């Protein structure tokens, strides 16, 4: 509740994609940009091309946009994503929208930046399948269009082009995928008290009150990222891990000692995937804890949770209302965060909460 205060602030209304020097959309803070990777039009253009190039997969059929489609709110609407040869991983594809505001990347926060994150899917066997990044560099150093774009963006050609520049360009493009100005933003920060429906307004009260959603999906005085950028065990996936936690942890640690990468382990092993943040921190307290995702555009980014196990927003509300389980008679995880407990919401409150979450949709995605 301490994060939520009713004040009014007017900000610039802006649509995707965000120009280099533009103010942030209504409801969002200034965009964090690394000092060593400033935004430029040339870099963004290059990053856009890299993001959509299917030659960077072993089959020539998969690119970043395969799992992050613009016309599907930069997700793929699958429970878990499909890579080369229709191989599936273990995780639901997070939206790229507003990923630039996240303190860490991936569900378990295993990479600290968009730059670091962008390199991993290329070399994951269930995503784009390359053995290493050499094929990417071979293409961009020889392709005439890439040669021109890299020279304009970085002043580099030939062997001067490395994965550092590739990652920086992709990250620069992803930092343009920004969206605010939702009905909630216009209601909360724009002073338009008719921007949300009566049901959504009631849902907002549930969100900040009895539902306690705001404890993790933060709303602040002048902006709302709808995430605290922290990791929590809310009970998702517990049944997969139940009674074999020690065995799975031991197997994972042994694999790491043999040189296995976390990125590959968590996407190719269903049990390892459920370790969550523990796979990164090594702390038992982080078992099955996953990053708090933003709720912006949530109506367009289902299925939900790290494993895509909840199909609808109604399922999500039911899951939380039951204290960390979709079915009230299912067992509860013994590792639940302390704040996860039954909410005792009425059917009307649950319906209103769903309507509020639908009011977090930015106009450019409203018709998707």
Positions of the model-derived regions?
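Post-cleavage N-terminal segment of exported redox proteins
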Residues: 2-46, 50, 102, 117-125, ...
